A protein has these predicted regions:
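Sec-dependent N-terminal signal peptides
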Residues: 4-14
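Glycine/tyrosine- and acidic-biased, solvent-exposed loop/turn segments at the edges of beta-strands
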Residues: 15-131
Length: 131
């Protein structure tokens, strides 16, 4: 949980126009089935995952947050971190609504090098090169 706080604070500082890059964040909604998604500037946060953050060519790229609604994941599951061309890439934290979280690096949307914690902060699994 401590790791999520560090990443969240870093994200907020980097996204601040005074401290970080003054790039304006955008809101996108993910449409479609895995993994043939389309990202659109309109949608319903009750149905589609909602992304807020940096965008390039109409896709998440840079720092951003995505929150998943009920029906796809349990409502409130979210990812905070880096994106490259629509995929989670780089450092980030995925937090499940039950309090569990994965903290570490991502590669092409896959957990890569990091740690999965339960809701009490106990280590459940360590990922190395996606395994």
């Amino acid at each position: 949980m401590k790791h999520s706080l560090i990443i969240l604070i870093s994200f907020l500082l980097l996204s601040s126009p005074v401290i970080g890059n003054s790039h304006k964040g955008e809101t996108l909604y993910r449409w479609g089935e895995c993994c043939d998604w389309a990202w659109k500037g309109f949608g319903d946060k009750e149905i589609q995952p909602k992304y807020q953050g940096e965008v390039e060519n109409g896709k998440p790229n840079g720092l951003g947050v995505i929150i998943y609604p009920d029906g796809i994941w349990k409502g409130g599951d979210k990812y905070v971190g880096e994106w490259i061309h629509r995929w989670k890439n780089g450092q980030g934290t995925f937090t499940w609504s039950d309090g569990g979280e994965y903290v570490g690096s991502w590669k092409n949307g896959t957990r890569w090098n990091g740690t999965f914690y339960d809701k009490n902060g106990n280590i459940i699994y360590k990922y190395v090169n996606g395994r």
